[in-house]
């Protein structure tokens, strides 16, 4: 057998809350509902939501070049597309995930009031992809979310046309004290080298809005 065991471990307890709501409103009169999901670990917006202009970047260097004068009081929109030419798609994912993970931290350094990121998805569709993000001590915490690739294209096109685009956005997520969970451990002891170890790992948990079948049920 596999000698299954459970190992107690404390894990973060973050709750999404009510369904997120977002709209974009442009100076040219466009108003479109945006498909949005709070990033795991994000704070909420104010209870009444927030509204601020969007400024688009693709890289950390873009943030640095724009500086606080251009960014302060705005929502930073990280719009780096995944590269479809990589055969191993994790390479494309790995290049873009830095903005989801640390975008709120880096944007806040320049006075941004929020951060949104293009979903890490090679397709153009209406489905936002959540994922983990982080905050750092001594850096202001700002809300962070992912928008669908279709909505990312709409926002980017409007900005490219020179329009002022504002995001009206509300999310109510919150973080509670850590809660107990378990690592699941299985062991198949070899016959030839029973005291040597080959370690394989994966995750059985999934995001609250997913089913976990392919991330990472299939992987496990």
Model-derived features: positions:
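Catalytic-core environment of secreted peptidases
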Residues: 1, 68-70, 74-96, 114, ...
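Noncatalytic luminal/extracellular "stalk/propeptide" segments of secretory-pathway proteins
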Residues: 1-75, 79-87
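Short Pro/Gly-enriched beta-strand edge/turn motifs at strand-loop
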Residues: 2-8, 162-171
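Short alpha-helical segments and helix-capping/turn motifs at coil-helix boundaries
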Residues: 7-8, 19-20, 60-65, 98-105, ...
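Solvent-exposed loop/turn segments at secondary-structure junctions
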Residues: 12-15, 61-62, 82-85, 120-124, ...
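Extracellular/periplasmic catalytic domains that process cell-envelope and extracellular macromolecules
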Residues: 15-16, 46-50, 68-72, 108-110, ...
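Second-shell loop/turn segments in exported
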Residues: 23, 41, 45, 52-57, ...
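Loop-rich non-cytosolic ectodomains and luminal regions
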Residues: 70, 104-165, 212-219
């Amino acid at each position: 057998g596999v000698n299954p065991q459970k190992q107690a471990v404390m894990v973060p307890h973050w709750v999404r809350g009510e369904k997120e709501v977002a709209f974009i409103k442009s100076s040219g009169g466009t108003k479109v509902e945006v498909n949005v999901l709070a990033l795991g670990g994000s704070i909420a917006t104010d209870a009444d939501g927030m509204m601020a202009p969007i400024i688009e970047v693709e890289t950390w260097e873009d943030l640095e070049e724009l500086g606080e004068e251009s960014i302060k009081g705005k929502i930073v929109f990280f719009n780096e597309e995944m590269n479809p030419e990589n055969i191993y798609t994790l390479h494309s994912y790995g290049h873009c995930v830095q903005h989801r993970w640390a975008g709120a931290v880096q944007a806040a350094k320049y006075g941004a009031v929020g951060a949104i990121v293009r979903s890490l998805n090679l397709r153009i569709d209406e489905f936002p992809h959540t994922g983990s993000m982080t905050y750092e001590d001594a850096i202001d915490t700002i809300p962070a979310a992912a928008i669908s690739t279709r909505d990312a294209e709409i926002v980017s096109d409007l900005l490219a046309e020179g329009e002022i685009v504002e995001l009206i956005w509300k999310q109510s997520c919150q973080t509670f004290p850590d809660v107990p969970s378990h690592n699941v451990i299985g062991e198949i002891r070899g016959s030839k080298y029973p005291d040597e170890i080959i370690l394989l790992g994966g995750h059985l948990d999934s995001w609250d809005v997913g089913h976990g079948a392919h991330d990472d049920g299939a992987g496990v």
